[in-house]
């Protein structure tokens, strides 16, 4: 990893300050650039805040429109709907870096990560997912800041990618617990002889999927082995996660101020909800379970589309139920009036729109990027308040710390959103950037435009996409060819955002100097 001098970083800060109004990532960005601390971690200062507790819940792949507050008329989420009624609702949260691990880096630090530089996919070595790696040496996490302010900090997570060997997302937590078995976690030994998957998919689809993705059967082999093992302990993994969170709350709620950070991988695929939630959305589920949606464009028959959508909705309802168990426990313990509750997600998923499912660098559209952000304050302060305008995940750390009367690290590039809540200031961000790998999307109130931001490293051909959000709010019809002046303007915005962060988003990994 290239090192940058403090003088270089100061120059970068000046350049970034000039671009901040265009990309609008943060009011703190220029100062933050000059505080990029070389190759070492700097301990957060000792601080005294107001000692409010924080319960932060992140559910992976949770679309905003799963909730009534964001327009749901199908998915049943009564517990989160109740939380929304008591919360500040941020209307337009879109991630800066995607998917899973890039977003967790932003959530942990409050710092922008795009453009990305490193490429560690899994524990076996380099992969093809830019930004998918552990925290930098220099990063200062929310948990580290709170520990120095006297907090007890707990991370309870079933997200398998956080648990990979060498990952360090537990930094700053005085307690962490990994719940095993999600997706391709190395949790159960798959059989040497590939099982019969005819109960999962029709034979024609299974053949097409295997031809499109030679590793598909291997994936199914590990997933089904994992599922067989974790079903011994409950109907879903989020059940185990929530039960552990409830246990931790009962044992530690009176230990002083605390941060309880809960990470649920559900409703991330594979989509295999308990039958009692699936039946809410599909009375006749058919002979095939369709647990894993296709990442490629495959010929999914109508019955497969119906089952996949019902599977996803059932997963979301199951997550809601178990989050409800955590929330009701907090209420039982008398925590609702001295605790800040936060619910959000990293990204959403396509459910057959434009013939596509899940997410990818070719589908940075509303269904993937629009996610919920609910913040419930003690005494239901500002309950039901809707905050318009674009916000991003890096705003959460400074916003939370502000409500705790604590100062964020100088490395934070996000913005405290409180003035937008109180009306002291209006949100002036005219656009935000969301990136998936080497592709970035510029979202404005009128348009959503996506294109390759690193043409040197992107492999393959990518045709820029443009969606007219006024005429096409679901972003289904690409109109890039009809609007060259719009694409040119938005491409310039994307280029400025990338150039403004080129040095700010660098860091170092585990360097040892003797």
Predicted regions and their residues:
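Long, internal low-complexity/basic segments
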Residues: 3, 11-14, 29-52, 89, ...
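Catalytic-site neighborhoods of secreted/periplasmic enzymes
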Residues: 106, 111-231
């Amino acid at each position: 990893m290239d090192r940058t001098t403090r003088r270089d970083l100061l120059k970068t800060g000046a350049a970034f300050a000039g671009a901040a109004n265009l990309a609008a990532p943060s009011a703190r960005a220029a100062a933050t650039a000059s505080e990029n601390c070389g190759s070492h971690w700097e301990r957060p200062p000792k601080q005294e805040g107001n000692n409010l507790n924080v319960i932060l819940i992140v559910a992976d792949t949770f679309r905003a429109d799963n909730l009534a507050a964001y327009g749901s008329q199908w998915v049943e989420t009564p517990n989160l709907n109740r939380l929304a009624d008591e919360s500040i609702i941020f209307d337009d949260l879109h991630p800066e870096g995607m998917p899973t691990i890039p977003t967790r880096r932003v959530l942990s630090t409050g710092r922008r990560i795009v453009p990305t530089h490193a490429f560690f996919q899994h524990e076996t070595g380099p992969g093809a997912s830019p930004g998918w790696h552990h925290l930098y040496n220099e990063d200062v996490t929310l948990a580290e800041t709170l520990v120095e302010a006297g907090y007890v900090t707990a991370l309870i997570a079933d997200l398998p990618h956080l648990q990979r060997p060498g990952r360090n997302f537990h930094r700053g937590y005085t307690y962490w617990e990994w719940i095993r078995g999600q997706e391709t976690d190395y949790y159960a030994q798959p059989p040497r002889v590939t099982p019969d998957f005819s109960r999962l998919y029709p034979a024609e689809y299974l053949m097409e999927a295997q031809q499109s993705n030679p590793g598909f059967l291997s994936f199914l082999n590990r997933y089904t082995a994992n599922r067989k093992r974790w079903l011994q302990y409950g109907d879903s993994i989020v059940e185990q996660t929530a039960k552990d969170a409830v246990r931790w709350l009962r044992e530690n709620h009176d230990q002083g101020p605390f941060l309880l950070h809960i990470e649920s991988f559900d409703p991330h695929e594979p989509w295999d909800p308990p039958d009692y939630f699936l039946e809410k959305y599909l009375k006749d589920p058919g002979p095939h379970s369709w647990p894993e949606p296709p990442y490629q464009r495959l010929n999914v028959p109508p019955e497969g589309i119906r089952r996949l959508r019902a599977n996803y909705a059932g997963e979301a309802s199951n997550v809601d139920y178990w989050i409800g168990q955590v929330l009701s426990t907090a209420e039982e313990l008398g925590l609702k009036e001295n605790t800040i509750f936060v619910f959000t997600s990293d990204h959403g998923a396509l459910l057959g729109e434009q013939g596509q499912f899940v997410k990818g660098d070719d589908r940075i559209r509303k269904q993937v990027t629009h996610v919920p952000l609910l913040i419930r304050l003690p005494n239901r302060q500002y309950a039901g308040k809707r905050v318009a305008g674009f916000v991003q995940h890096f705003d959460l750390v400074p916003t939370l710390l502000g409500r705790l009367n604590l100062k964020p690290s100088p490395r934070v590039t996000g913005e405290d959103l409180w003035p937008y809540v109180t009306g002291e200031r209006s949100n002036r961000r005219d656009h935000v950037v969301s990136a998936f790998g080497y592709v970035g999307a510029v979202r404005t109130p009128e348009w959503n435009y996506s294109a390759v931001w690193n043409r040197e490293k992107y492999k393959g051909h990518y045709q820029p996409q443009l969606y007219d959000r006024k005429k096409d709010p679901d972003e289904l019809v690409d109109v890039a060819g009809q609007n060259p002046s719009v694409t040119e303007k938005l491409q310039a915005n994307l280029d400025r955002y990338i150039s403004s962060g080129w040095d700010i988003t660098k860091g170092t990994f585990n360097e040892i100097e003797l």
